[in-house]
Regions:
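S-adenosyl-L-methionine
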Residues: 1-46
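Short amphipathic alpha-helical segments, especially helix-boundary/capping motifs
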Residues: 10-16, 58-59, 80, 112-118
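Short linear capping/connector segments at secondary-structure termini
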Residues: 17-19, 119-124, 179-183
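Short, charged/polar micro-motifs that form catalytic or ligand-binding hotspots
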Residues: 23, 27, 74, 128, ...
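Hydrophobic (often cysteine-bearing) scaffold residues that line and stabilize catalytic clefts
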Residues: 29, 33, 80, 134, ...
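Conserved S-adenosyl-L-methionine
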Residues: 33, 39-109, 196-235, 243-249
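Conserved phosphoryl-transfer catalytic core
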Residues: 77-148
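SAM-dependent nucleic-acid methyltransferase catalytic core
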Residues: 135-246
Length: 249
């Protein structure tokens, strides 16, 4: 019997989101497509309230908010709660301008001999993820972002989003399929040993530009990202919803 060839619908996967503004800010492979949610929400009444009990990267919440709806989503992972809040928040022109002005300040911190990096996270065999030069750069950059003086903490959020993009981009992890693997360490080196800081700075600068390019695209609706266990929804949300969209397994 001839095998049936099934064409992959990339437009229903995370790849469709890559260049769609805030949806592409930070890629996590299992994320599903914006198109999927838009099609499901399309027939809702104007005052509909949307629930996603498994937020993930908050694709549902952001889609609903962009279409003017009220959305709530639940996530047990604190980092994903932070990411969902960052993606669905409003950013003022002042916040965006302040953020863009920090590139030079961060560069000065990175090049300062007195700059002290944050401690690297206690990951087993961390050099399997980042080479020593990259790890040193990332630890100094994180310290700079943490300590830079800002009047608006939303600016720090944008700086951290760009940091996450750079951290993933410069890692040895390969995200081209669902089960993560590692790149060949011999082919990993993007840059030579000399002036690696300057090259890494360029990567971060480009990632920050990408984040800022859609930061002003504030959603017209609202989204609440709740840190909690979706098995106990009745303790986390106390009102009814018109549509429930759950993440795919």
């Amino acid at each position: 019997m001839a095998q049936l060839q099934v064409k992959q619908r990339i437009d229903y996967t995370h790849r469709h989101n890559t260049f769609l503004g805030r949806h592409g800010w930070l890629r996590l492979t299992p994320a599903y497509s914006v198109k999927t949610v838009d099609e499901l929400i399309g027939s809702c009444a104007e005052d509909a309230q949307v629930l996603d009990p498994f937020a993930g990267t908050s694709t549902t919440a952001l889609c609903a908010a962009y279409q003017g709806y009220k959305a709530a989503t639940v996530e047990i992972n604190p980092f994903l709660v932070w990411l969902g809040d960052a993606k669905t928040s409003h950013y003022s022109p002042r916040s965006i301008k302040t953020t863009s002005e920090q590139v030079f300040s961060l560069s000065q911190i990175l090049r300062s001999e007195d700059a002290s990096p944050v401690l690297a996270p206690p990951i087993h065999n961390i050099n399997r993820w980042w080479n020593p030069q990259t790890l040193s750069f990332l630890c100094k950059l994180k310290k700079g972002i943490d300590e830079i003086k800002l009047d608006d903490e939303r600016s720090r959020t944008l700086l951290l989003l760009a940091f996450c993009r750079t951290m993933m981009k410069l890692s040895k992890a390969d995200f081209n399929h669902q089960s993560m693997s590692f790149k060949d360490s011999d082919s990993f080196e993007f840059f030579g040993m000399e002036n690696h800081t300057g090259e890494y700075e360029k990567v971060y600068s480009e990632d920050l530009k990408f984040v800022l390019s859609s930061a002003s695209d504030n959603p017209g609706g609202s989204a609440e990202v709740i840190n909690g266990d979706a098995r106990f929804l009745n303790k986390l949300v106390n009102h009814k919803f018109d549509l429930v969209i759950t993440s795919p397994p």
